[in-house]
Amino acid sequence: MITSPPNEQTGEHTGSWLGVFALALAAFIFNTTEFVPIGLLSNIGQSFDMTPAQVGLMLTIYAWVVSLMSLPMMLATRNIERRKLLMFVFGLFVVSHVISAMASSFAILLVSRVGIAFAHAVFWSVTASLAVRIAPPGKQVQALGLLATGTSLAMVLGIPLGRVLGEALGWRTTFLGIAGVAALVVFLLARALPLLPSQNSGSLRSLPILFKRPRLMAIYLLTAIVVTAHFTAYSYIEPFTQTVSRLSGEMTTILLLVFGGAGIMGSIVFSLFSDRFPNGLLITAIGTLAVCLLMLLPLSGDATMLGTLTVVWGMAIMCFGLLLQARVLSLAPDATDVAMALFSGIFNIGIGGGALLGSVVSSHLGVANVGIVGGLLALGGLGLICYTTFLFGKTQPHAEMQADAKH
């Protein structure tokens, strides 16, 4: 890791758990707002006389704006000091949420979500590398785990609480509440983060170099396939549980809580085993995800079995996301922000693609089949990781970077 001179006061020599914690809270806010519509599809649809499948397209639009803008926004902001950049990002985030809460039409709601997506594109392009950068020495994996905990808590608390608030006071109140919490997080970030001059951000010149790294390209392809598989089913978990499983609104909220809690368990598994069994854990996570999605419909009639499946599903997808994030950082240490911007963009292509595919499946085959379609895609991802593990198993990751340096 490249360090800065002491007079820059970056705080990177001793590390800062407080700074990592602040970033984890920020991650909580961003992941809450990205996925909270999943628990409010029916309510938003009622406001604008739309079906859940139609409203679900807002997830696709949001995700694809993030995917398209992640790299351009990262490059446009690559020379900006990172703490200042995060302050600007959260300012845009708060204003856009206020507009969401006041939206008089679905079109205005979509415009406000695009504003949030722009903020999201910048945030996730820099946050993982910042967490690793400011973590105490030797605690980089744990820092990523804490960041993932913030993401998981969005599933555990953010999305279910957003749903409860939306059910009780209307979905607009949920967006106002997110704006209020985000405003508080801004102050914490300002106090907790040191000055963080941009470093190792990369530039457009980094792209041809990154594209020559087969391991990295395989990770990006795997990301697109598996994330699409997951969100084909997860984007429509609310209508699935209510129309197929016949669960009440309260039980649906509990199921969302269970899924998020499982994500925290998955981040713990990642912290404990990712260093020792990186390939085995990744293959296991994808295989487990495929089984969970394929069994979603067969187990939908038994609430206990569905809850158990949800726990395993949540653990698997969290392990998968963390493993790929860590692998991208390790394969592109010379251009972390560019590599993570690409990863964030591709991840969101998967989110949007999954939401769109789930909408098509729901409209033409019925929402009951979203798990089957997602599971088949996940099996494709399992085949890809098994092949690439065999192909690159004996190749050291640094060999690719050394080859780049010779050109």
Swiss-Prot record:
Q: TM segments?
A: 18-38, 55-75, 88-108, 114-134, 141-161, 175-195, 217-237, 253-273, 280-300, 304-324, 338-358, 365-385
Q: Which Gene3D superfamilies match?
A: MFS general substrate transporter like domains
Per its UniProt record, what Pfam families does this chain match? MFS_1
Q: Which GO terms describe its molecular function?
A: carbohydrate transmembrane transporter activity
Give the PROSITE patterns listed for this entry.
Answer: MFS
Q: How does it sit in the membrane?
A: Multi-pass membrane protein
**Where's it found, cell-wise?**
Cell inner membrane
Q: Which GO cellular component term is one of those annotated?
A: plasma membrane
Q: Give the UniProt keywords, A-Z.
A: Cell inner membrane, Cell membrane, Membrane, Sugar transport, Transmembrane, Transmembrane helix, Transport
| Main subcellular localisation | membrane
Alphabetical list of InterPro entries matching this protein: MFS, MFS_dom, MFS_Efflux_Transporters, MFS_trans_sf, Sugar_effux_transptr_put
Role this protein plays: Involved in the efflux of sugars. The physiological role may be the reduction of the intracellular concentration of toxic sugars or sugar metabolites.
Q: Which PANTHER family match?
A: PURINE EFFLUX PUMP PBUE, SUGAR EFFLUX TRANSPORTER
Which NCBIfam families does the annotation name? PRK03545.1 (NF002921)
Its protein name is Probable sugar efflux transporter
